[in-house]
UniProtKB/Swiss-Prot annotation:
Stretch list, region Mn 1: 114-126
GO CC annotations, alphabetized: axonemal microtubule; centriole; ciliary basal body; cytoskeleton; sperm flagellum
Family: Belongs to the FAM154 family.
Protein name per its UniProtKB record: Stabilizer of axonemal microtubules 2
GO molecular function annotations of the record: microtubule binding
Span list, region Mn 3: 248-260
InterPro entries on file: SAXO1/2
Mn 6: annotated span: 350-364
Annotated region (Mn 5), positions in chain: 316-328
Mn 2: region residues: 148-162
One of the Pfam families matching this protein, by short name: SAXO1-2
Species of the source: Homo sapiens (Human)
Amino acid sequence: MGAKSMRSWCLCQICSCGSDYCPYEIVKQPRHVPEEYKPKQGKIDLGTTYKRDLNSYKVQPVAIVRPLERQVKKGKLDTVPTYKDDYRAWDLHKSELYKPEQTYHPPTVKFGNSTTFQDDFVPQEIKPRQSFKPSSVVKRSTAPFNGITSHRLDYIPHQLELKFERPKEVYKPTDQRFEDLTTHRCDFQGLIGETAKLCRPVHTRVTQNALFEGSTEFRESFQPWEIPPPEVKKVPEYVPPTGSMLLNSTSHLDYVPYQANHVVPIRPVSQKRSNNFPFQGKSIMKEDFPAWESCRQGLIKKQQQIPNPSGKFDGLSTFRSHYVPHELIPTESCKPLNIAFKSSVPFDDVTMYSVEYTPKRQEICPASYPSPPGYIFDNTNSQGHKFFRKIIPAVKAF
């Protein structure tokens, strides 16, 4: 009990309204080390359910259902449908009206312009009710305005310390090698393997005073060789032939002429028409597909079992023949009379809320006081948090 009473409490722990909040230090979360990837052993099964469950079938060509020979019927085509033959129009007669003739007689009395609502409504005097709403008039106080706030009362001015001016540091480049490590390189490190061997030849630095050789690998591998001069062929002197030139060719000497006949054309000779009658216009289509000799089809309608009525149509229905008119009796109105209810008893303005409401005591946050009741100021830490200590009640000695 003594150790608990000696403990100091921060102002944010004493506060009950949550206005005084002290930030706490952020604890860094532990870093998750990823596990090393280990590839699975064995081969991948590339089989699928489609390859396993598929059963192939032999596909055969579809047999032709269309008949080989075409049957052409002769006769004229009947374009009259069965609807027009079976359902013919009836001779309709206009039915007489059964509504009684009523001649309108205008009223002789002058129209009063009064409705049933105006006749039944009794005007009543409206009495204004007593208003329980508080008045909106602002009451000005005569006392002077007290502009002292809790901030002005509790504020303690402190003397500002002189700012420490840090001297400007001269930049000195480091001798150590720059480590360009990132979070990705730290977290995802590669597997340890053998270092790659350089295939690049050793770079020999050329001194400035040495002359540039200008030799390449191609020049060293393919060196020039001596080409012997071409041999000059001696051209013999031109000796012209003796005698005259023969202009006969092998075609002139070996050619034998033949007597060939003209080709007879296969196309028939066009003969001009000597007749004067008009063009018939016959074609293979018209000769193969002549007009059908069609006959009118008989009625497919069944014979009527019920005989048709004879005589004039009465137009009476079962409702009209059995209907008996009755006199209308007006229903009695059960609506209460619209008369204001007057009572001499005063109005009882007591509600369930005013009866059952229990006012609660408004608690004041202890942190709003300059020194919370029941606590003694202890100290202030480096972050500016105030700490208080509970007052131990005095125990009377017997």
